[in-house]
Each structure stands twice: as structure tokens, then as C-alpha cells.
């Protein structure tokens, strides 16, 4: 899954990249808050640079920060991560369900039974059919976009001639398709137990049940794409205002603590205030002018020393290794010439960008692929890119880049002309740091004769770049495992059925053999052998230069003096927002 706050860090690192999160246990992830009895009441305020979050519809949320936020306050799922500090935070606990799922039939069948007393914000009882309907929505891929795609791949539903599911979602009236879906996702007679029939063994299917793609939605209240503006709550808070300036959540009177062992709502209101300048947000926290405020992203790299060198902020800051791999995603359809893709990698001044972002203290280390080292079982340096590779020079290997461009000049002249005259267009999220990093990148690429043009996107970044018709030549992107298996990294990023394949690599001559390897790895039930295959596929993806990897990172978080209960939540790579409280 991707991560919004880290996207800005990646923009700093590359002037165009992003990140994502995983369920990997982060060694040394710490709580910055002392053990103090939480207080109830007050308004908890989050300060955000962008005009709005990308999505509120639980079926469409796929960024770690927004998952952590919405699942803490509004969206209940069958299973949840335990909201506690340290490694235990990666453990699954029952949420809407009475347990963490019961597998059978070699993990091709999974059952979850709903706990009693759960309701929507209008008081309607949550039933199996509501969860079943929520699951059905993700098959309407022309309407419900941007969320995880695992259900479309794993559920035992027949495929149409074009390889897509015969079930097209609830907005298309097709009795046969609906029947096929309900055979794969069925409800018990008492409407409390939901059963999933899969087309393969998936031993960790219950980790997917922490996502909103498996959460209840009332069919009569579903407004398709517009449900994204005002989804119904099943958690302790509900939306009171969703405007251009703020998202305001208030207590949900229909929620019952007796039916929810995961959440304890402390503030009376939770507000995200949109459109704040990033420097202004940092100054608010530095000056403590809104002591109940939290920076919803990360502080600017230029302000990190102000937060982390001053002892008065000791209880208002965190600096953790994160499980994210940042990179630039090449749009292979727009950039089919591998020599130009390689030349961009070798001409990039990785050291200058890392130094600007804070070096190893704040930014992280040079990436060797897209599988994070924190995903220990599946990680190994690829030795194709980054440290350990023969041609990697942090400042840029300009002779190598120039030689590649010389080859491209005759091998792919049209692409060469685009790279040297028209310019390569790079999608980035709008940030004040671009004023500093664009000149670094522009000068670096120019050493190889490559011209770049940046495309800052101020709102709806992921919905924009995930649309093939709107994506530019490269896009700020990145990924971390959805849970502790690279089956949620390599296929998601590079397979035709992946939910976050920004590389558009299906027409690449190397793709067919690569996908064959992916399918073989996904069918493996021997975890050690599977790990070997994921490592090899990471190597192959780097050799194909479908992405330009940048760093394995670190993340910083800061907040006001009257915010308590802050700790780093391992599986989401963000603070556990639902545990925060106001101390005033």
C-alpha cells in the first residue's frame, strides 16, 4: 500500500517519488508518549497541506496514513491490527468478527462470524449481506477505483474471455454474474457468517480483512462514486462536515464500546484542516500556537533539526525507520527505450537529494530494489541498482549514462529526441520542497543530455497517476508490503493484475517471462522457496528498469504539547491516530 505523508519525503528525495507501508515489524519503532492516563474530551486537530484526502470510501483507500486514520475513527473491518506500540501492533485481533477468521480446505475457504451489537451510524444492524455487498463493489472497477485488487484475483469467480471477472459489480444488472459472486462470497441463513471461496490457497487472507474492501456498506445508501464524499460510519465517529476547508468527525451515538474491543474514542471531535502551507504547519507546531494539533504529514526536511535537536520537543516527535521503498515508476508505454530509462537512473544525483532530505539521520539509505530490508524473509540486495551494484555511484555515473544515451540515439531515435528536446515529464505531488529539488534533478539529468519537465499535482495525486490516460512519463510512486510477504509487493507493482502497477509494463518484451515467474511464486506454499523467488523477481524487475528506486526510508512525526498517547503503529507505518487524546 502507498503512504501519503511519505510521498512528500520521496518528492524531496527524487523530486518525484512516493511511498507505501507494510505490516513488517519495524525494529526500534518507539512511543514518544509517556505512560499517562488518557483523558476524554476536546478537539484533536490534524493539519494537512493538500486540499482533501484522496478517498473516504473504505473500498478505495489504499494509503497507509489514510487507512490508519479512517480505520481508527470511522471504518470497522472484520479483522484489525492491534493498536499498541512495538511488534505486538502487527498482530491481528477480531474487529467486526468474533475471531480472526477460520480457514479450511487448505486455506481456500475462509469464514468470519460477525459479533452481535454492531451497527451503522443510522442504527441499522450490520449483517453478513452488508459485508457481502461491500465486497461486491470492488468489482465495479470503472466506478470503485484505486483500492486493493486482491479480491478480483483471489475469489473463485469465473473469468470472462478478456481475463476479467464475469461479475462486474452491483451497478451492472447481470443475474449470472451476481450468482457467480454469491457462490464465492456467501452468507449463512442467520446472516451472521460470511464465507469466502478462493481459487487458490491463501494462508494470510485474513490480513486482507483489515482493509475496507471487506467492510459493510448498505446497498440502499450506496451512491457509487459519490459514496466517496460521505460514507456511512461503523466506528466511534461519523462525518459532520466534509468541505473544502476541513473534514470534521463527531461522536457516533449509535456506536457501542461493548461491541468494539479495538477502539476507545477519546476526543469529542476529530478535525482535519486542509490547505495549510507546509512551512506554516511546522511553525504552528514549533511555536505551539495550536497545542492540540498534529502535523498530518511529516515536517519539512529543512525543519527537522529544529524539532530533533531541541530537548523541549522530546515528547512531541518521532523518528523511525519505516518499511517503505521509494522509487520513480517509469511509464513503460511512454518510455519503451530501456537505455533512456537506465540513463535516467545513472545520471541522477542520489547523494545530493539524500543530503538535502537529511541524510541517513532523517531520510534513510539508498534503495537496492522495491522489497524493503524490513521485510527480512524476502529481502536481499539486488546488486543491479544501489549499493552492491557494479555501476552505482551516489553522485551519478555520468560516463555510463552518456554511453546509454549514445546507444539510444540510434536504437530508439524518437525516444531519444523526446528525452533530449521535448523533455521527460515527471508527475509529483505539489510541495514547497520542489523549489529546491527541481534544480538538483534538472542539473543532474542534464549531464546526460536529458531534459525533464515536472508536473506538480496539488490534489488527488494517486487517482490522477493511476489513470493511464493521465499519467505522465514517470510518476512519484513507491510501495511497502501490505503485510509480511512480498506477494503483496512484486505482483502488486509489476503484474498485469496488480493493484498499483504504474509501470504499464505489459507490452515490454520481458514481461511475459516475468509474469510467469510471479504466478509460480504465488502458487508456492513453501514460504522459504517462495522467498527465494521473490528475491529473484526483484532482481529481474530492476534489470528491466520498470522503476527507478531511490531510498529505503525513515519517517518523522511531530505534534503539539497537549496531544497525548502518540506512538508509532508498526503495520500502518504511521502513528496510531485512534489512541491520541487531548490533554487540556
Spans of features found by a protein language model:
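N-terminal lobe/hinge region of extracytoplasmic solute-binding protein
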Residues: 45-105, 232
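Surface-exposed binding/hinge segments that line
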Residues: 113, 130-132, 137-218
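Long beta-strand-rich cores associated with HINT superfamily self-processing modules
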Residues: 557-584
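Structural transition elements
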Residues: 364-409, 430-436
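Extracellular/periplasmic solute-recognition and catalytic clefts
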Residues: 150, 240-250, 271-333, 351, ...
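Periplasmic binding protein-like
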Residues: 44-46, 123, 284-292, 426, ...
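Gly/Pro-rich hinge or "lid" segments in bacterial periplasmic/extracellular proteins
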Residues: 83-87, 179-180, 197-269
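Extracytoplasmic/peripheral linker and loop segments enriched in polar/acidic and small residues
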Residues: 37, 187, 342, 354-357, ...
Amino acid at each position: 500500500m502507498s503512504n501519503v505523508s511519505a510521498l512528500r519525503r520521496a518528492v524531496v528525495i527524487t523530486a518525484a517519488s512516493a511511498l507505501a507501508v507494510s505490516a513488517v515489524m519495524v525494529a526500534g519503532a518507539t512511543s514518544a508518549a509517556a505512560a499517562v492516563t488518557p483523558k476524554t474530551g476536546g478537539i484533536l486537530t490534524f493539519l494537512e497541506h493538500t486540499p482533501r484526502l484522496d478517498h473516504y470510501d473504505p473500498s478505495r483507500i489504499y494509503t497507509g496514513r489514510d487507512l490508519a486514520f479512517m480505520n481508527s475513527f470511522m471504518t470497522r473491518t472484520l479483522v484489525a491490527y492491534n493498536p499498541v506500540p512495538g511488534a505486538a501492533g502487527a498482530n491481528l485481533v477480531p474487529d467486526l468478527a468474533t475471531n480472526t477468521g477460520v480457514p479450511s480446505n487448505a486455506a481456500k475457504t475462509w469464514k468470519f462470524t460477525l459479533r452481535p451489537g454492531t451497527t451503522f451510524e443510522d442504527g441499522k444492524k450490520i449483517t453478513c449481506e452488508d459485508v457481502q455487498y461491500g465486497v461486491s463493489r470492488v468489482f465495479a472497477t470503472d466506478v470503485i477505483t484505486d483500492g486493493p485488487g486482491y479480491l478480483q484475483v483471489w475469489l473463485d469467480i469465473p473469468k470472462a474471455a478478456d481475463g476479467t471477472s464475469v461479475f462486474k459489480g452491483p451497478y451492472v444488472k447481470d443475474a449470472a454474474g451476481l450468482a457467480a459472486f454469491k457462490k464465492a462470497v456467501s452468507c449463512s441463513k442467520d446472516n451472521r457468517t460470511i464465507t469466502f471461496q478462493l481459487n487458490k490457497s491463501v494462508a494470510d487472507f485474513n490480513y486482507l480483512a483489515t482493509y475496507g474492501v471487506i467492510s459493510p456498506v448498505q446497498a440502499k445508501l450506496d451512491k457509487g462514486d459519490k459514496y466517496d464524499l460521505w460514507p456511512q460510519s461503523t466506528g466511534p465517529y461519523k462525518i459532520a462536515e466534509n468541505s473544502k476547508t476541513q473534514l470534521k468527525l463527531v461522536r457516533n451515538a449509535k456506536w457501542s464500546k461493548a461491541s468494539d474491543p479495538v477502539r476507545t474514542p477519546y476526543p469529542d471531535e476529530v478535525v482535519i484542516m486542509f490547505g495549510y502551507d507546509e512551512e506554516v504547519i511546522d511553525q504552528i507546531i514549533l511555536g505551539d500556537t495550536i497545542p492540540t494539533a498534529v502535523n498530518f504529514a511529516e515536517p519539512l526536511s529543512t525543519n527537522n533539526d529544529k524539532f530533533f535537536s531541541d530537548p523541549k520537543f522530546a515528547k512531541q516527535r518521532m523518528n523511525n525507520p519505516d518499511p517503505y521503498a521509494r522509487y520513480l515508476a517509469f511509464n513503460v508505454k511512454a518510455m519503451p527505450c530501456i537505455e533512456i530509462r537506465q540513463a535516467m537512473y545513472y545520471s541522477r544525483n542520489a547523494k545530493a537529494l539524500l543530503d538535502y532530505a537529511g541524510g541517513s539521520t532523517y531520510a534513510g539509505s539508498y534503495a537496492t530494489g522495491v522489497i524493503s530490508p524490513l521485510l527480512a524473509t524476502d529481502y536481499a540486495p539486488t546488486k543491479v541498482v544501489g549499493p552492491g551494484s557494479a555501476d552505482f555511484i551516489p553522485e551519478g555515473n555520468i560516463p555510463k549514462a552518456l554511453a546509454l544515451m549514445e546507444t539510444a540515439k540510434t536504437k530508439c531515435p524518437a525516444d531519444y529526441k523526446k528525452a533530449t528536446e521535448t523533455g521527460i515529464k515527471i508527475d509529483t505531488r505539489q510541495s514547497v520542497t520542489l523549489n529546491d529539488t527541481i534544480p538538483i534533478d534538472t542539473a543532474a539529468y542534464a549531464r546526460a543530455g536529458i531534459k525533464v519537465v515536472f508536473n506538480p499535482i496539488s490534489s488527488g495525486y494517486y487517482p490522477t497517476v493511476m489513470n493511464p490516460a493521465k499519467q505522465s512519463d514517470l510518476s512519484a510512486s513507491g510501495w511497502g508490503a501490505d503485510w509480511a510477504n512480498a506477494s503483496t509487493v512484486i505482483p502488486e507493482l509489476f503484474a498485469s493484475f496488480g493493484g498499483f502497477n504504474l509501470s504499464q509494463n505489459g507490452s515490454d518484451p520481458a514481461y511475459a517471462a516475468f509474469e510467469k515467474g510471479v504466478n509460480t511464486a504465488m502458487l508456492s506454499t513453501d514460504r522459504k522457496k517462495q522467498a527465494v523467488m521473490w528475491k529473484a523477481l526483484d532482481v529481474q524487475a530492476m534489470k528491466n528498469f520498470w522503476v527507478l528506486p531511490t531510498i529505503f526510508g525513515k519517517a518523522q512525526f511531530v505534534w503539539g504539547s497537549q496531544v497525548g498517547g502518540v506512538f508509532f503503529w508498526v503495520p500502518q507505518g504511521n502513528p496510531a491516530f485512534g489512541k491520541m487524546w487531548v490533554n487540556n
